Structure formats: structure tokens, C-alpha cells
From Swiss-Prot:
InterPro entries assigned: NAD(P)-bd_dom_sf (IPR036291), Sc_DH/Rdtase_CS (IPR020904), SDR_fam (IPR002347)
Source organism superkingdom: Eukaryota
Binding site for NADP(+): 47-76
Protein name: Putative steroid dehydrogenase 1
Organism encoding this protein: Caenorhabditis elegans
Transmembrane annotation, as ranges: none
The keyword NADP appears for this protein: yes
Active site (record annotation): 202
Alphabetized GO MF terms: oxidoreductase activity
Keyword field: Lipid biosynthesis, Lipid metabolism, NADP, Oxidoreductase, Steroid biosynthesis
Enzyme Commission (EC) number: 1.1.1.-
Similarity annotation: Belongs to the short-chain dehydrogenases/reductases (SDR) family. 17-beta-HSD 3 subfamily.
Length: 314
């Protein structure tokens, strides 16, 4: 009798465990992307300006256009002035009723005083949304001691993938806290969701983005400020080296629109429904399967780059 009760109890626990994960996965996939309606971003932001870093290409540029479409003035920040000027012109041609400003900034090797100067410019306007998008990847996946560019490249990737989200958030929050309103979105990567051989620095820096965003949401969420970590998989951008779209690979415009619609519904999500499906499946796989898949992906990326450059990668 005792054995029967024990077996029944274990069975019930297993069923509840499976049911819990099924409900969690279903809500993570369908909640932000199907069930929930987009919130009033202007009301939650509490101000009319949106700042976007890494705004002249890919996801950052698409965020800038989508925010302009939704009526925000846009302050774009990137390294190259000519590209900033061109992006500003493009935005105003489509959305002439908003204002666009820009600031040139090299995120790879800034001093604290450089950040203070940038923040002084940004804080001239009332910022309701901050999109910390700027980021960097290596030329191709590689073991730490073999990374192309050596410790200089390693330092650049570490700095650019961690400091901007941290320091710009710290410098703009003093605007948002008194208003009890504001939105800060930090763009990470699905690469931060698993430990990845040959992606060690990139994966670790993207995990940092996810982690600090979660910490800051707990610090400031009760004050009316939204923090969100977006962890996309493959998006058809120049940085990804893949201009072709597919069911699992949206273009950056489609992605940015989808990701903005999840604000207020998920503090950490991939930003796109098929990416969320990939993410939830990834979490169910054993490590050895993930490791094998990552190894194959890394080899394919190196092979593709070698083919483009007509030389082997050692």
C-alpha cells in the first residue's frame, strides 16, 4: 500500500512538472507575440525622445525607424558621422514630422570623460526610451588564444558589449526616476543562453547584458521604469553575415517591430516568435546536443568566411 501511494505521488509530481513546463513554454511563446496587445509606449516612456545606439545599421537602424514611425523623436548614436547623417536624412524623408539628432561616438575605446560628454549631449532632451543596441562580434568563432586580432579584439568586444548598456543606463536613469516612467531595452543574443565553445567572450558578454537587465528591472520596476533584455537569434543583418530571410530569420525591420510590441509584456524575450520557439527548444536539449550543434555552426561559419576570402582559416 505504501509503495502504491509513493508511486502515485511520484507520478503526480512528474505530471505537474511536465504540465508546469508546458504552460511556461506556451506562455513564453504565445504571450508576448499572440495574446498581448502592444502597450502605449509614449505613456510608459513618459517623454518624447528615444535614444538608439548602433543606429546606422541592422537592428539599431530598424529600431530607429520604427520608433520614429510611432511618433518619437530619435537621437541616434554611432561611430561614423557620414552614416549618421545619411540615416538621419532617411528617417526624415519617411517621417518628416519628428526630430532627429545624432552624436558620433566610438564605443570600442572610450574614457569615462568621453561617456560624460556624450551623456551631457543626450540629457539635453527628455529621453523616454533608451535602446542599448551597439555590439560587436569577432570575425569568426575561435578558441580564446587563437582569436583573430588577439587581446585587442577581445578587449574591444568585451568593452563594447558590456559598458554602453551599463553606463548609458546609469547616466539616463536620473531623468526617468523622478518621472516614474521610462523604458530601457538592452539587446543581447541567444548566444548568452548557453555556454558556447569558441564563442566564449561573445557569449559571456551577452549573458552579462541579460543578467544586468534582470537586476535593474528588480531595482527600478517598482518605480515605473521598464527594463527589457532582448536576446535574438539570427536576424538578416550585415553583422550576422546573412542577408537572406527565412521563417526563422526575419529582416531587421520585421524584427524591430515585433520586439517593440513585446515591451511591457516580457522582461526577457527573444523579440520574435520563431526565435522564441528556437529558444524554448534549446532549453530542453541536453548539453552534448547543444555543444555538437554549436561546433558544427562554428565550423560552417569559418568555412563560409574562408570561401569568401579564398583562404583557409587557421
Amino acid at each position: 500500500m505504501d509503495i502504491e501511494w509513493f508511486a502515485t505521488g511520484v507520478g503526480a509530481v512528474v505530471v505537474l512538472y511536465i504540465l508546469y513546463h508546458f504552460i511556461r513554454i506556451t506562455l513564453n511563446i504565445l504571450g508576448p507575440y499572440v495574446f498581448c496587445q502592444p502597450i502605449d509606449l509614449k505613456k510608459k516612456a513618459g517623454a518624447s525622445w528615444a535614444v538608439v545606439t548602433g543606429a546606422t545599421d541592422g537592428i539599431g537602424k530598424s529600431y530607429s525607424f520604427e520608433l520614429a514611425k510611432r511618433g518619437f523623436n530619435v537621437y541616434i548614436v554611432s561611430r561614423t558621422q557620414s552614416k549618421l547623417e545619411h540615416t538621419k536624412k532617411e528617417i526624415l524623408e519617411v517621417h518628416p514630422d519628428i526630430e532627429v539628432r545624432f552624436a558620433t561616438f566610438d564605443f570600442t575605446n572610450p574614457s569615462v570623460s568621453d561617456y560624460e560628454k556624450l551623456l551631457s549631449k543626450l540629457n539635453e532632451v527628455s529621453i523616454g526610451i533608451l535602446i542599448n543596441n551597439v555590439g560587436m562580434f569577432f570575425d569568426y568563432p575561435e578558441m580564446l588564444h587563437k582569436i583573430n586580432g588577439g587581446i585587442d579584439s577581445i578587449a574591444n568586444v568585451t568593452i563594447i558589449n558590456t559598458l554602453p548598456a551599463t553606463l548609458l543606463s546609469a547616466g539616463i536613469l536620473p531623468q526617468m526616476v523622478p518621472r516614474k516612467a521610462g523604458i530601457i531595452v538592452n539587446i543581447g543574443s541567444v548566444a548568452g543562453l548557453a555556454t558556447m565553445a569558441e564563442w566564449s567572450v561573445y557569449s559571456a558578454t551577452k549573458k552579462y547584458v541579460e543578467w544586468i537587465t534582470g537586476c535593474l528591472q528588480k531595482e527600478y520596476g517598482h518605480q515605473g521604469i521598464i527594463f527589457q533584455a532582448i536576446t535574438p537569434a539570427m536576424v538578416a543583418t550585415k553583422m550576422a553575415g546573412n542577408p537572406n530571410t527565412s521563417f526563422f530569420t526575419p529582416d531587421s525591420d520585421t524584427f524591430a517591430k515585433s520586439a517593440l510590441n513585446t515591451i511591457g509584456h516580457a522582461s526577457q524575450t527573444t523579440g520574435y516568435i520563431t526565435h522564441q520557439i528556437e529558444c524554448e527548444m534549446l532549453k530542453l536539449l541536453p548539453d552534448f546536443v547543444i555543444d555538437r550543434s554549436i561546433k558544427q555552426t562554428s565550423a560552417q561559419l569559418r568555412e563560409a568566411l574562408a570561401k569568401n576570402e579564398n583562404k583557409p582559416l587557421m
